[in-house]
Amino acid sequence: NKVIAEQKAPVVVEPLRCRYPQGGEKQLCQAITGRQVPPGGLPADIGCAVFNINTTCAIYRALTTGMPVVRKIVTVSGSGVVEPKNLECPIGTPVSSLLDACGGLKDGTYKLIAGGPMMGMAQYTADISVAKGTGAILAFCENEEKTVENPQCIRCGKCVSVCPMHLEPLFMYQYASKGMVEELNDAHIMDCMECGACSYICPARMHLTHMFKTGKQLLKDKMA
């Protein structure tokens, strides 16, 4: 704030609570402006444009030097990584090369994830490349995963209480698992941001977010 004041920059720093997923663009709009993005809408619908730091820096470099986005800082971490690091690499770098630069994977490594712990996608192999949106590569050991065979919803409502989009995950799960497309549409499943908060809080260890991704695809196929 002091530097901004000294340079008389037209910038206001707005402190926010450290609460996941506060960094989501729709959540930021509401927290900062008090305006809520309508269902199915975008920040532009309420007069907002949201850019993160990486995008802002990329725009600056493109305008001042003509350099496109060709490099990426990737966090390689998790209990399965020998020596976790933050690495800057060219886009297109094999993930296996990043893991090698971190000393490789430990024995017993069970799961490899491209992305963060909440929204990342599980990978079956390290023979993939770093993309523009790759922010992290995580590896975890088998003894850390807590799974339940044939999980059943206990109707506790915790998933509803933590949903940042004010959806009802317990009903959406039922609709998606049974292929009830019209009900999925009425439940506004396309507004789900796949943050993973519902899956994280679920005491029954139900794979809610995974099922919502499936439900979204069912709805897209129906509307195609």
Task: Annotate each predicted stretch with a short phrase.
Residues 21, 28-36, 103-154:
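Active-site gating/interface segments in enzymes
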Residues 1-12, 16-33, 155, 189-190, ...:
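Iron-sulfur-cluster electron-transfer modules
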